[in-house]
Regions:
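Alpha/beta-hydrolase fold catalytic core
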Residues: 1-25, 48-49, 89, 155-165
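Active-site loop/oxyanion-hole signature of alpha/beta-hydrolase fold enzymes
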Residues: 56-95
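Conserved HGGG/HGGXW glycine-rich cap/lid loop of the alpha/beta-hydrolase fold
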Residues: 9-63
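Residues immediately within or flanking Cys/His clusters that coordinate Zn2+
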Residues: 169, 237
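Conserved hydrolase catalytic core segment
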Residues: 90-130
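Short, non-ligating residues that shape and space the ligands of small metal-coordination modules
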Residues: 181-182, 249-250
Length: 254
């Protein structure tokens, strides 16, 4: 791990994919967590991003000053400021995890907005509290409808984050939720929905089947077969994270 100093104490960070990448993404863990606690998220992020994990004071390999409380969000934002100077980052995307990581990212955005390209809040039902209106266009929040139960559901968070980064926010015509684009393959009697090549996650086979197997909405397979005609072919289709509805008619999407 690399080191930088904040008020005379050692903080640490690790860089991944540092060669040949054009953008920097800093992953900010929840209160009291080391940077490695969010490393499972990294495999879902496009390869053009350099990924940075941070150990704030009191966490991981960083120093723990006497009496230091590790959930001081404003203080952690100041540690991020020192990281930017030490590592030479001109601008980065911040991804906050949990309430603490999101509050730290929010505080840094308010302090140094010129250094932030985007902030992605992953905590469920998270609402920014201290951002002026002019900074809100930099904020991206993963909707509750895109988050499945489970504290460490990196797969769904990664998919949602990737979709937001690509600007693909197709809306469900039934409930307004965000839909995931995929392909129907097979035949009417044996239809299968999988993520299409545009948002395929390397190293995660049959992600669409994972979705169906673990989060199959009522009547989903029947809707899938109705959408598919009798001939064997490939069709683009969208699945709503919120209500589970499936559609192939882009013109009707809102």
């Amino acid at each position: 791990m690399k080191e930088f100093t904040y008020r005379g104490h050692k903080c640490c960070y690790s860089e991944f994919r540092s060669e040949g990448t054009s953008k920097t993404m800093i992953l900010i863990p929840d209160d009291g967590r080391a940077g490695y606690s969010v490393q499972d998220f990294m495999s879902y992020i496009p390869s053009e991003y350099k990924l940075v994990l941070v150990d704030f004071l009191g966490c991981g390999e960083a120093d723990t000053p006497y009496g230091y409380v590790s959930d001081l969000w404003q203080d952690q934002a100041m540690q991020l400021k020192e990281l930017f100077f030490a590592a030479g980052y001109e601008q980065a995307i911040l991804v906050g995890f949990g309430e603490g990581g999101c509050r730290t990212a929010e505080a840094f955005l308010a302090e140094m907005p010129e250094r932030v390209e985007r902030v992605i809040f992953t905590a469920k039902s998270f609402v920014p509290r201290s951002l002026p209106e002019e900074l809100l266009p930099k904020v991206m929040t993963i909707p509750d409808s895109m988050q499945y139960p489970g504290e460490n559901n990196w797969r769904t968070l990664g998919l949602a984050c990737r979709q937001l980064l690509q600007g693909d926010e197709t809306r469900c015509p039934y409930c307004g939720g965000i839909m995931m684009r995929g392909l129907i393959t097979g035949s009417r009697d044996l239809a299968r929905w999988t993520i299409d090549d545009g948002i395929h996650i390397a190293g995660v086979p049959d992600e669409g089947e994972f979705y169906l197997r673990n989060h199959q909405p009522k009547g989903f397979l029947e809707n899938l077969k109705d959408l598919f005609n009798k001939e064997t072919e490939r069709k683009t289709a969208y699945v709503c994270y919120a209500c589970g509805k499936l559609t192939a008619d882009i013109k009707n999407l809102i």
